[in-house]
Amino acid sequence: MNEQEITRREAVKLGLLGAGAASGLLLGGGALAETRRADAGGAGAWFRISLAQWSLHKLLFAGEIDNLDFAGEARVMGFGAIEYVNAFFKDKAEDIAYLNEMNKRASDAGVEQLLIMCDGEGNLGDPSESARNVAVSNHKKWLEAAKQLGCHSIRVNAASSGTWEEQQRLASDGLRSLCELAEAYGLNVIVENHGGLSSNGKWLSGVMELVDHPRVGTLPDFGNFCLDWSRVDEADAWYDRYRGVEELMPFAKAVSAKSHAFDDDGNETGTDYERMLKIVKDAGYRGWIGVEYEGGGLDPRAGSVATKKLLERIRDGG
């Protein structure tokens, strides 16, 4: 029995062949063997590699796969853990039967479920106290869903308005309230640099200090440092990504390896991954790093695998 046969049998068992995951790219090279190598190598390494669901957003929005396929997709590509996006099961947060099916799919695939990235539930830094309270309340169902799935965190946004100091005060107030709620579930509330002042590392690290709660943390993203998306092509609309990650790492409970394009040597063209991973390692982080491929030059699966291979090469000194 060769690796190709093992891989195809595994894919059939996970119900992936009908979903298009049995492409030559993924299955032709012995994906199951690649998964075993990654899992074995990752166990003793300083970080392991997970897959953020947003990497496959084009396939999900197109209906080529659905949320329940995600765990199996990640398994075939060699990932040991997954990070969900609430948009892909927005109406299922309180559906215990559905969440249990997600648990079953993840268990069958042999992947861990790490966190849920939550959007569209209101601004935790809204100037209106009542609106902030509604936003906190809206996130409760995602805390419950994350608990049901065995996740360690939900990722939220710190959107606000006003002056620098006003936004820090408002965002920290909403986050602290949510952290107090999350404490009962044993879950963390982590904030990503995700536009506006949240993409300013100094501002967001200041928010963390103001919240001053053991359940709060950051999810530094290698690429999300645009302060004004309406001026995305202008240099001064961007915060220095290396400085930003360095400022956010002391509070990190997860890390996102954003990628868009690669050169002929497999290096990401917009981010110096060696430099970025050194910042992450020097901060003392020892956990999962999530691949989030957002480019258009490669198929979503191919881009995700390319990012994973780049992380492995640097991590393993290859």
Residue spans for each PLM region:
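C-terminal helical cap(s) of enzyme catalytic domains, especially alpha/beta-barrels
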Residues: 301-316
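Acidic/histidine-rich catalytic cores of soluble enzymes
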Residues: 46, 81-82, 172-279
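Structural motif corresponding to the early beta-alpha repeats
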Residues: 80-176, 183-188, 224, 229, ...
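C-terminal segment of N-terminal export signals and the immediately downstream linker at the start
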Residues: 27-54, 60
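Acidic (Asp/Glu)-rich catalytic clusters
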Residues: 39-46, 71-76, 94-114, 140-148, ...
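Acidic/histidine-rich helix-loop elements
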Residues: 54-64, 128-130, 227-234
